[in-house]
């Protein structure tokens, strides 16, 4: 899952390629990981940073979003990711030219969750439909994700 896409991996790859062909640039940087293993199942958390450059209100900007990828893994013939769910912790918008900050629509900006509001703003203004209830640092969405992780390691099925 992502702020702008929910669906199968093959479709994500296809629409990502299509976006790249149109000039969409989204970079992901990965940091440290922790992994809990229980038999043929595992749950990992990996620090991540997402950077997207695009026009925001007529100004070229970078949005930098920091969080974690929570991966539900299973060993079948080999280890593989069954589900990847981001947790969005914080973000910011940075004009490429600091002398030209964008004039943001405060109402629109504040309509998005705190952990990814600038990313959601940029993506919305550039034609994407953004999922409004992704997990952040706190709240029912992240608590439900943690509960799913505990159940996953106990052998229960994912609620999707």
Language-model segments: what does each one mean?
Residues 1-52:
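A solvent-exposed, acidic/Ser-Thr-rich amphipathic alpha-helical stretch
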Residues 30-32, 66-70, 83:
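Extracellular structured ligand-interaction cores
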Residues 76, 80-160:
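Terminal "cap-and-tail" regions of soluble proteins that handle hydrophobic small molecules
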